[in-house]
Curated annotation (Swiss-Prot):
Protein EC: 1.15.1.1
Protein name, per record: Probable superoxide dismutase [Mn], mitochondrial
Organism: Debaryomyces hansenii (strain ATCC 36239 / CBS 767 / BCRC 21394 / JCM 1990 / NBRC 0083 / IGC 2968)
One of the Pfam families matching this protein, by short name: Sod_Fe_C
Taxonomic lineage: Eukaryota, Fungi, Dikarya, Ascomycota, Saccharomycotina
Annotated Mn(2+) binding sites: 36, 84, 173, 177
Length: 211
């Protein structure tokens, strides 16, 4: 690895999870979580760090064309890392209140009722958007800082992520590696099951931090 200050500043690491791999069962198997975290997420971390190192080298050599190509890898692997960090935070076992809807006395709960009528309706809309993703991608429940703090459900393809003014509250991975070992090609069952372990408390904190 390069010892340059720029690389050291930009290096990322695989985060530790707040729960055991098997603690989301039966909704998401421990094996899926272990492979997803240790293998897939780690690949994005390694790819990003490698691309940063290559970029520093290309810039030091004045190789603009190479630097432009490398930046695409940085975007892909950096997006993969960013999305997965939020994905893990979006999940929690039932013992940590995973799946427990935000109360009507919370700011997020009030906003959901105001815009969607019920949390179940928001979930249905999110699942419909997840099902509409062709290939690999993500769905995010977001707060729009420039639209009166209104909520929305947006999707991205591959490892594209959301940026300002959108604040991601919940991220759901629609890549096959997130569900295929357990749900095979019936991804609708995965989309339905994951809400049993969604960390609404974390979503509420993120909502409140951008009031």
């Amino acid at each position: 690895m390069s010892n340059s200050p720029a690389f050291g500043k930009n290096k990322i690491e695989l985060p530790q999870l707040d729960w055991a791999y098997d603690s989301l069962e039966p909704y998401i198997s421990g094996k899926i979580n272990e492979i997803h975290h240790k293998k897939h997420h780690q690949t994005y971390v390694n790819g990003y760090n490698s691309a940063i190192e290559q970029l520093i080298e290309a810039e030091s050599q004045g190789d603009v064309k190479k630097a432009i190509v490398i930046q695409q890898n940085i975007k892909f692997h950096g997006g993969g890392h960013t999305n997965h960090v939020l994905f893990w935070k979006s999940l929690a076992p039932n013992s940590q209140n995973g799946g427990k809807h935000p109360g009507s006395d919370t700011n997020l709960g009030k906003k959901i009722i105001e815009q969607y009528g019920s949390i179940d309706n928001l979930i249905s809309i999110t699942n419909a958007k997840l099902a509409s993703i062709q290939g690999s991608g993500w769905a995010f429940i977001v707060k729009n800082k420039q639209n009166g703090g209104n909520l929305d459900v947006v999707t991205t393809y591959n490892q594209d992520t959301v940026t300002d003014p959108l604040v991601p509250l919940i991220a759901i991975d629609a890549w096959e590696h997130a569900y295929y070992l357990q749900y095979q090609n019936v991804k609708a069952d995965y989309f339905k099951a994951i809400w049993n372990v969604i960390n609404w408390e974390e979503a509420s904190k993120r909502f409140d931090s951008h009031l």
